[in-house]
Amino acid sequence: STLLGSLLQVLKFNLDRKAERVRVFELGRVFLRDASVKSSDTTVEGFHQPMRVAGLAYGAAQPLQWGSKEQGVDFFDVKGDVEALLAPLQAQFEPAEHPAMHPGRCARVRVAGREIGYVGELHPRWRQSWDLQQAPVLFELELDAVLQRPVPGFRPVAKHQSVQRDLA
C-alpha cells in the first residue's frame, strides 16, 4: 500500500473548497506482504508495516506576487523539498518507474546507496480520474531513513569569555 491515495483525497477536498495552492504531508504505516513476519502484539502475520512520510505539492510554486508571473509547481521544487528534508545527508536521484507516477517524470531516492523512496509527478491516468487541472508532484520516503539524519548537538556557552592578547 501507499500514502499517496490519502494525499490525493486531501488535495481533492481542498480543491473542492477553492484552495488554489496546496502543500500537504502525512506520516503513516504502509502494509507490504512479507511471509517472514510472524504475528505478535505489534505485528500482523504476513505483513510488514513500515512507517513512511509522504508529501504533495499542487498549484503555484510561489504565492501570487505583483512582480512575477505565476508558475506551477514542478518536479524540481519537490526534489528541493526532499533534499532539504534529508539534509545534511546527500540524496541521489535516478530515473525510475512507479505505478502512481508519470513515466519519465519519476525518480528513485537513494541515500548511502540504499533506496528510500520515490519522487515524481502524478501519472496522467490518475490525474484524469481525479479531475485535476494540473499534475501534483508527490514524494514518499521511508521514515526510518529520514530520522537517521544527524541533528546538530547542543554545546553550552562558555562561562568565561576567551581572551586574546598581543604580547609583542
What feature does the model see in each segment?
Residues S1-A168:
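Extended beta-strand-rich architecture
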